[in-house]
Amino acid sequence: MYAVFQSGGKQHRVSEGQTVRLEKLDIATGETIEFAEVLMIANGEEVKIGVPFVDGGVIKAEVVAHGRGEKVKIVKFRRRKHYRKQQGHRQWFTDVKITGISA
């Protein structure tokens, strides 16, 4: 059984027991969260596709950890003009473990 849900402007395909990395959520570590924006649920041959969301579809997950991703360097450069700018960015994320999928 797997499902596709929407969080942080992105779509994620998950199954029970899987850990997935999402955009930062303001929820403490160890707490439970429910995602109601379920786009699709598949259980063997039975497939439910939402218009746009599945009625009564809920994905339950537990927040495992918060953190920051790898550093991305941004460079702005003009040749022969002695001009260079550098900037770094580390995106915040939340790791959640999927505990249940229901329709």
From Swiss-Prot:
The keyword Ion transport does not apply. One of its GO terms (molecular function) is structural constituent of ribosome. This protein binds to 23S rRNA in the presence of protein L20. Keywords: Ribonucleoprotein, Ribosomal protein, RNA-binding, rRNA-binding. The gene is rplU. Part of the 50S ribosomal subunit. Contacts protein L20. InterPro entries: bL21-like, bL21-like_sf, Ribosomal_bL21, Ribosomal_bL21_CS. HAMAP family: Ribosomal_bL21. NCBIfam families: L21. GO terms for cellular component: cytoplasm; ribonucleoprotein complex; ribosome. It comes from the Bacteria. This is Large ribosomal subunit protein bL21. Belongs to the bacterial ribosomal protein bL21 family. One of its GO terms (biological process) is translation.
